[in-house]
Amino acid sequence: MSSAGVPHTDLWPLLLYFELVLVVVGTMLALPPFLGERRTRRTPATEQPYESGIVAVGSSQLRFSVRFYLIAIFFVIFDLEAVFIFAWAIAFRESGWPGYIEILIFIGVLVATLVYLWRIGALDWRTPRQRSIEATIHQ
């Protein structure tokens, strides 16, 4: 074996893998038009959502408040940070005092973020109109 380059005999697994990836991707792109759903005619029954045999009442398109998505994003962010805290708890003995100080800073940032979100009203589910009505009632 020469030190000038990689011998060609060592590259065959990589080339085979590349060719197989191309075949799989090509197959995945080529087959859907042949295997997919074909709609030849549209009827009112095919346009309705399937409700397990129950006649649909009203629209199947529900409108959710943007606040719902905002709360969901906050939940995902804080849940992910909880995973980091669990990982720190597993390595608690190995990290020592520096790790303890770092997790205190991390939790402090979490608490500061939560207080900030609470103060600006991002966690408040009420609309501005509901808040103003409540403020006039409590005066």
Swiss-Prot record:
Pfam families: Oxidored_q4. The chain crosses the membrane at residues 11-31, 70-90, 97-117. It catalyses: a quinone + NADH + 5 H(+)(in) = a quinol + NAD(+) + 4 H(+)(out). One of its GO terms (molecular function) is NADH:ubiquinone reductase (non-electrogenic) activity. It is an enzyme of class 7 (translocase). It is found in: Cell inner membrane. NDH-1 shuttles electrons from NADH, via FMN and iron-sulfur (Fe-S) centers, to quinones in the respiratory chain. The immediate electron acceptor for the enzyme in this species is believed to be ubiquinone. Couples the redox reaction to proton translocation (for every two electrons transferred, four hydrogen ions are translocated across the cytoplasmic membrane), and thus conserves the redox energy in a proton gradient. NDH-1 is composed of 14 different subunits. Subunits NuoA, H, J, K, L, M, N constitute the membrane sector of the complex. This is NADH-quinone oxidoreductase subunit A. It comes from Methylococcus capsulatus (strain ATCC 33009 / NCIMB 11132 / Bath).
